[in-house]
Amino acid sequence: MVSAYVHSGEVGTQKQDDKYRFLERMLVRMPELAKHSDHVLIVGDLNVGHTELDIKNWKANQKRAGFLPEERAYFDRFFGDIGYRDVARELAGQVPGPYTWWSYRGKAFDNDAGWRIDYHMAT
């Protein structure tokens, strides 16, 4: 079991470049872990909404860190090429949410205008 935190990033900054470097390293490490065990679980706050189902207001956030196409492409590979499973999505089905983060502004929690940025990825 691996617990991970990926910082949120910020478009056009070194912080975003660091986030991409971390996600790149995950692409290398995740298959290595799977070679050593049939049961690998990676959990944590990864600060990326993978699909439109993972963020309530996805259209307005397409150019913001956390929902950039480049970030989402890493998750396509985690759940595609590398073969990990998105446990929460499998349990919830193809429906919006369940969200794991809400802004403190604009009554986001009250309106369930959240993001799903926390994951349980399993082999």
Model-flagged regions — what are they?
Residues 19-20, 121:
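Short, positively charged
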Residues 13-18:
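Short, solvent-exposed loop/turn segments at secondary-structure boundaries
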Residues 2, 31-33, 123:
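Intrinsic structural disorder
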Residues 5, 47, 120:
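Anionic group-transfer/hydrolysis microenvironments
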Residues 1-10:
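Active-site-proximal beta-strand elements of phosphoester/diester hydrolases
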Residues 22-117:
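Metal-dependent phosphoesterases centered on the DNase I-like endonuclease/exonuclease/phosphatase
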